[in-house]
Structures are given as C-alpha cells and as structure tokens.
Amino acid sequence: MKEDIQPKYGDMTATCSCGNVIKTRSTLAKDIHVDVCSECHPFYTGKQKVVDSGGRIDRFNKRFTRRSK
C-alpha cells in the first residue's frame, strides 16, 4: 500500500451566527462560519422565524406584484 496518500484529518470548529460552537474533525484545514445550526434552525427548535437574506422576499414580491396588476 502507498503511504501518506490520505488527507490530513484534524480538529476544526464550526461557529454559528447564533453563537453556538461545534467542534468536530474534518479534512478541512480551517474553521468555518455557518448561518444556521441545529440550535437555531426552525425545524429543530419548533419556532417559526423568517431567515431573509438581503431582502430577497421583498424583491421577489415587488417584482411579481407589478406583473399581476
């Protein structure tokens, strides 16, 4: 078998925008930042909240309400 062909497998940290920190192991060499996690996602929490990134919903509604008039 060939030696040293496997990627390096080390510790990494995923930080959520809600402040939750998840420590795991991965071949990814750097820490990452995520928008939602299991602590703040509406499916897991049971609370309904709108995750609107940059007013996309408003732009969509504005664009298609003009056409329907």
Curated annotation (Swiss-Prot):
Gene3D superfamilies linked to this entry: Ribosomal protein L31
GO molecular function, a single term: structural constituent of ribosome
Cofactor field: Zn(2+)
Pfam families: Ribosomal_L31
Family annotation (InterPro entries): Ribosomal_bL28/bL31-like_sf, Ribosomal_bL31, Ribosomal_bL31_A, Ribosomal_bL31_sf
Binding residues for Zn(2+): 16, 18, 37, 40
Keyword Ubl conjugation: no
Transmembrane segments: none
GO cellular component: a single term: ribonucleoprotein complex
Cofactor note: Binds 1 zinc ion per subunit.
GO biological process, one term: translation
Keywords: Metal-binding, Ribonucleoprotein, Ribosomal protein, RNA-binding, rRNA-binding, Zinc
Function: Binds the 23S rRNA.
Family according to the record: Belongs to the bacterial ribosomal protein bL31 family. Type A subfamily.
Subunit structure as annotated in this protein's UniProt entry: Part of the 50S ribosomal subunit.
Xref: HAMAP family: Ribosomal_bL31_1
Name of the protein described by the UniProt record: Large ribosomal subunit protein bL31
Species assigned in the record: Teredinibacter turnerae (strain ATCC 39867 / T7901)
Gene symbol of the encoding locus: rpmE
